[in-house]
């Protein structure tokens, strides 16, 4: 039986892989999990799985681009038990040649990958300041560090999110809030990723070129447990075989 803490973890962008793995990892430590994605019914299986293992989780349908929706979600999470960690994990990874990048595409990707992160971070900070501390983690990507061909919309949004995280870390660190940006610098091991790589190369991906969601989640847990006198702000994660 998991010993329950009087503390909440909220994940905005609780997808099937990284977000779900983070939820499972923190549920094992007794945190109350509050999970948000556009269609919250897609989280029913994960919520049931966590409950069956003795944990506590709730699913929420949230449009992270809505200030009202994000505010209501984090208010509810903090009311259930004081927030200790908020994770922003929305990707919006799309590839469009620059001449095919419409205004709508560019704006929507920015809203999902940057603006929604700002809303999440601001509202998380509001609660964590009242709670006298905690952590806010932003999931980044290779595109957070460099703009690849066809990734003008995605990379510009991820660059922006990284800047939001840096500014928040400098402002909030002295107030006992650990703000971190995690760069996921490789493909995550999923059936879809394996299929795409094999279609492109004609061979299965090497075992040392993919990241397991559970391994990524472990890094989030270790980061959250860091002592205040040795906080990491930016952490880049990649498998041993990934060229960089």
Residue spans for each PLM region:
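Conserved glycine-rich Rossmann-like NAD(P)H-binding loop of the short-chain dehydrogenase/reductase
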Residues: 31-45
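Conserved glycine-rich cofactor-binding loop
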Residues: 15-16
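C-terminal helical subdomain
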Residues: 174-186, 200-244
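Substrate-binding pocket helix/loop in short-chain dehydrogenase/reductase
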Residues: 97-98, 105-110
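Active-site loop of short-chain dehydrogenase/reductase
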Residues: 6-7, 56, 82-84, 128-141, ...
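Rossmann-fold cofactor-recognition segment
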Residues: 50-68
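Catalytic loop of short-chain dehydrogenase/reductase
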Residues: 135-160, 165-166, 170-173, 188
């Amino acid at each position: 039986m998991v010993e329950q803490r009087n503390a909440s973890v909220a994940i905005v962008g609780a997808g099937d892989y990284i977000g779900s793995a983070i939820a499972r990892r923190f549920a094992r430590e007794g945190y109350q999990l509050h999970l948000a994605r556009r269609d919250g019914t897609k989280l029913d299986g994960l919520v049931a799985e966590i409950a069956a293992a003795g944990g506590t989780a709730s699913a929420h349908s949230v449009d992270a681009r809505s200030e009202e929706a994000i505010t209501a979600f984090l208010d509810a999470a903090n009311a259930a038990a004081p927030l200790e960690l908020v994770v922003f994990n929305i990707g919006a990874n799309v590839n469009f040649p620059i001449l095919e990048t419409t205004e709508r595409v560019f704006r929507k990707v920015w809203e999902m990958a940057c603006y929604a992160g700002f809303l999440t971070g601001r509202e998380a900070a509001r609660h964590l300041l009242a709670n006298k501390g905690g952590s806010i983690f932003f999931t980044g990507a290779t595109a957070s560090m460099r703009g690849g061909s066809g990734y003008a919309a995605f990379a510009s949004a991820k660059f922006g999110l990284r800047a939001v995280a840096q500014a928040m870390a400098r402002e909030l660190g002295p107030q006992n809030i650990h703000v971190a940006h995690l760069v996921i610098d490789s493909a995550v091991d999923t059936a879809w990723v394996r299929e795409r790589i094999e279609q492109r190369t004609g061979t299965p991906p090497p075992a040392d070129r993919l990241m397991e969601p559970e391994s990524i989640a472990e890094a989030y847990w270790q980061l959250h447990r860091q002592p205040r006198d040795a906080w990491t702000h930016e952490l880049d994660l990649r498998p041993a075989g990934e060229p960089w």
